[in-house]
Amino acid sequence: MKSLAGHVVKYGKHRERRSFARISEVLELPNLIEIQTDSYQWFLDEGLGEMFEDILPIDDFNGNLSLEFVDYELKEPKYTVAEARAHDANYSAPLHVTLRLTNRETGEIKAQEVFFGDFPLMTEQGTFIINGAERVIVSQLVRSPGVYFHGKVDKNGKEGFGSTVIPNRGAWLEMETSAKDISYVRIDRTRKIPLTVLVRALGFGSDDTIFEIFGDSETLRNTVEKDLHKNASDSRTEEGLKDVYERLRPGEPKTADSSRNLLNARFFDPKRYDLANVGRYKVNKKLDLKTRLLNLTLAETLVDPETGEIIVEKGTVLTHQVMETLAPFIDNGLNSVTYYPSEDGVVTDPMTVQVIKVFSPKDPEREVNVIGNGYPESAVKTVRPADIIASMSYFLNLMEGIGNVDDIDHLGNRRIRSVGELLQNQFRIGLARMERVVRERMSIQDTETLTPQQLINIRPVVASIKEFFGSSQLSQFMDQTNPLGELTHKRRLSALGPGGLTRDRAGYEVRDVHYSHYGRMCPIETPEGPNIGLINSLSSYAKVNKFGFIETPYRRVDRETGRVTDQIDYLTADIEDHYIVAQANSPLNEDGTFAQDVVMARAQSENLEVSIDKVDYMDVSPKQVVAVATACIPFLENDDSNRALMGANMQRQAVPLINPQAPWVGTGMEYKSAHDSGAALLCKHDGVVEFVDASEIRVRRDNGALDKYAVTKFRRSNSGTSYNQRPIVHLGEKVEKGDTLADGPSMEQGEMALGQNVLVGFMTWEGYNYEDAIIMSRRLVKDDVYTSIHIEEYESEARDTKLGPEEITREIPNVGEDALKDLDEMGIIRIGAEVQDGDLLVGKVTPKGVTELSAEERLLHAIFGEKAREVRDTSLRVPHGGGGIVHDVKIFTREAGDELSPGVNMLVRVYIVQKRKIHEGDKMAGRHGNKGVVSRIMPEEDMPFLPDGTPIDIMLNPLGVPSRMNIGQVLELHLGMAARQLGIHVATPVFDGASDEDVWETVREAGMASDAKTILYDGRTGEPFDGRVSVGVMYMIKLAHMVDDKLHARSIGPYSLVTQQPLGGKAQFGGQRFGEMEVWALEAYGAAYTLQEILTYKSDDVVGRVKTYEAIVKGEPIPKPGVPESFRVLVKELQSLGLDMRVLDIKDSEIQLRDMDDQDDDLITVNALTKFAEQQTAKELEKKAAEQVEDERQDIIQNFETAEDNLD
């Protein structure tokens, strides 16, 4: 028998798939959320300590007191994750820091542990819980600190160069050439000064010294000529210093001293200027002589300074081989020259640089100095004079054609700031603010009794951390529609945020796909719209190194033997540029050598065919190019990229269904993405399952300890979907660390299951699938195939008001007993009650504003106490479209010790659960960007059926395929049908999946027709349709855009204050805008009365609409409309501009426009239904009250009279 296509692979303990992959996986996928967890772990282990060491010790102004850092520790968290969620608190641990205060006068030392506030902790899932809600800190993609060179063309078309030294924090140093070939520098974006002025200010004053250092060049001569010695009384250095000071502080008196201090503070003070580790690494790398000298011709003989033997002769071309012999000498400081700056320079320490003379590529006769910065250690975090001189040298060399310009969009020049670093920067800001306070307190307070505790004010530190988690652009409310959305959110890279780009300033280049993204950032997954290309996703195998650069793994190719080894090297983008990398699908022999002599490979931005002896590395996997969500699309290679982008983005919006089903046609990514997402319940230790039920799983470890795992049931996710876990292990089952114990939402047997496998036919039907609409069988409704559970949270708080506290109660004015039937004695809805729109959830009354009481009422108040005070009903009611079943009620009170915000006495939260079946108007999609709206749900019996009588589930429009070029859906359809017939699951990994032949082979194996099409019969008549139709199984998902959330109609609602027109939008219970073009339509139709009422009663004729309502209620004819409010606003606007504007009628008599006064307030905010009811009851109450007051008055008068008589 012929062997079947594909081979069986096991995913987790519970699922086997037939995989069509041809390439064996050399490397396991890393943990997909390690970018979050590792970064935060680094912060706790090292980052925090670094901060304290940076800021402390703090000395007072006289240098007598010094506050030093000893150690820090995080204590036990106050709440567990679950408690923090329930109490709306932060999941955080108290940070305690041990500090030592030394008094240098007395030698006294005091050590003390100081509390530094609560520090938010990361959960195991890579999220933070802030105020009870899960948040994710998105990693930021920023320009790396370092030195950059760029070409520029001025308006006359003359080419020039520019350079920038960018620190992590501190002043930028820029250099540029002008049209006259003069080089200038700018410090921190101020006015430019000639380059030589800065060199002189650094202490190298004379022209001779400058030419000695840099060598001769045209630009340098022009610059020196421009920079004349103006004031003979100053040395050249002092004059240079004054020139610099004038640019930085224009208008202030300039002295050499103040300039020295300024430059020192700007560039050489570690507190104000910081290159960071990464900046120092990038500067040393860019100014490295080993790369700069490659392929140049030496203009001097290089001699070993120790032995005196010649290393390389003059005139030698420095090829890679020559460079290899030379490299160790350069590293040891070959040709080092030490220059001594004059005493009045900014930095007086001697400066050592390496100078090697080469011939200019533009003019082989001329010698050029190439200056290296002498490799300062990585501990030197500020810029040194040697760095400035070496970068100037690089800049001048560029004009000679030596060196190359940088591409700022290259991932070698962009780095990632993850959680740890973002937090560290924020913490540093807090500590720096605190430092000021500490200094002040040191000088004010009595030194004898001072303790560290008294010096420290932790407010700024706490505030900066709180601000970061609460309101930073990078701290985001987690997208929790389903586990894939959660996972993708944690792996997101944003170029926006503080220190990043802004949407408006970002051009095309930044947003575009760059060759260096390969294996580092996904070229597919990015949002559509204004953020396209600014928000990206990390590729599946990518890691972030200690400098923040993204690395991707490659298999090393042994150059000697030509074998592809299993040794994996992680390369950053700039290192990869030096190598040639073969593609992952290059065929290999058994022994690991290439099967062909020529392979497809990449060298920088080129795709080449190269001979195998030139190949250095090979890709580890075909899916290393794309992100996790993209890797979940089968037959991705057959889809157009725009549609694949939509497919990747829409999978994140899939709503978790009641009984999820993993795809029959998967990619093999389903298990890993579900496992790492944080939504599944994972086993922490090996053991045996001892107890399983819906709410708890217990595992007995091999060492006898018992682990208990709580299973989450129906928790509301951030997006209002139901997060529910279901155990998939059974009693006595042996489990290992990392096994899935319970499926989370949108998971089945440990695999991601976002949708359902349904029988799909590509055919039109009565025009119901026009414009991508979807026709669906009623079976999908009846069998709850696309039914999802949604939980909404409503809250009501009882506050203290000026007029007295609000009260949660069952006694609500003007509400019948029937409306209170489901409220308990406190006035809170019972769990399990079924509620409709407008039903009471929490009864609450608020004291009404008491107007100035009359004498009689004051007397009454004195006699009868509180009775006379009115309250109004401010109960929590179910909003429109919010009906369902009460799932849970949480009550928080001060007495119970819950932390409530100031002024709140009680908080009630009600959770209402809805079971939503699929509906016309719901949005559905496949995985290939093929989205549509359900247009008709038809009875099963009317759907077209297969020859064996099976009715199909969904009909899609065949016209949606060719123009969109997402052919992957058709291949999925056929392979899915074959999988259904064979009763198997298949895996077709991206770029290495089932080929055309594999699909047809499987189709044949399943016994389907050779074209995989079938004849369909009309369900209504039983007649066959004309052509053969493609029918198969496609994985379709229901998206979060559901019609229940969008359907909306206004009855009586709020009006805008100024124009008095109805508000817009569902949230405001607004109306539909009847705009200019709609008015034209009614005018064209001649519907004058309809138009009149739309522009008056239904909109902003304030008096008219109230009168109309009353007329409808009383059954009287509707009165004539008045003048719309917006017209009055327009007239008043013109009057306010000083135009005498009046409105006249036909007879030229003036129409009076009503003027607003205080009485109109209630007229404006009309909520007519309740208002009418209130008026009626108010009249009755007034009548009763008046009668009562009259009776009381008679009694009182009588009592007075009696009393007077008695006195008489």
UniProtKB/Swiss-Prot annotation:
Gene Ontology terms: cellular component: DNA-directed RNA polymerase complex
Coiled-coil annotated residue ranges, if any: none
Any GO molecular function: DNA binding
GO BP field: DNA-templated transcription
Pfam families: RNA_pol_Rpb2_1 (PF04563), RNA_pol_Rpb2_2 (PF04561), RNA_pol_Rpb2_3 (PF04565), RNA_pol_Rpb2_45 (PF10385), RNA_pol_Rpb2_6 (PF00562), RNA_pol_Rpb2_7 (PF04560)
UniProt entry keywords in alphabetical sequence: DNA-directed RNA polymerase, Nucleotidyltransferase, Transcription, Transferase
UniProt-listed InterPro entries: DNA-dir_RNA_pol_bsu_ext_1_sf (IPR042107), DNA-dir_RNA_pol_bsu_external_1 (IPR019462), DNA-dir_RNA_pol_su2 (IPR015712), DNA-dir_RNAP_su2_dom (IPR007120), DNA-dir_RNAP_su2_hyb_sf (IPR037033), RNA_pol_bsu_bac (IPR010243), RNA_pol_bsu_CS (IPR007121), RNA_pol_bsu_protrusion (IPR007644)
Catalytic activity annotation: RNA(n) + a ribonucleoside 5'-triphosphate = RNA(n+1) + diphosphate
EC nos: 2.7.7.6
SUPFAM superfamilies in the cross-refs: beta and beta-prime subunits of DNA dependent RNA-polymerase
Top class in the EC scheme: transferase
Role, per record: DNA-dependent RNA polymerase catalyzes the transcription of DNA into RNA using the four ribonucleoside triphosphates as substrates.
Subunit field text: The RNAP catalytic core consists of 2 alpha, 1 beta, 1 beta' and 1 omega subunit. When a sigma factor is associated with the core the holoenzyme is formed, which can initiate transcription.
Annotated family: Belongs to the RNA polymerase beta chain family.
Protein name: DNA-directed RNA polymerase subunit beta
Organism: Enterococcus faecium
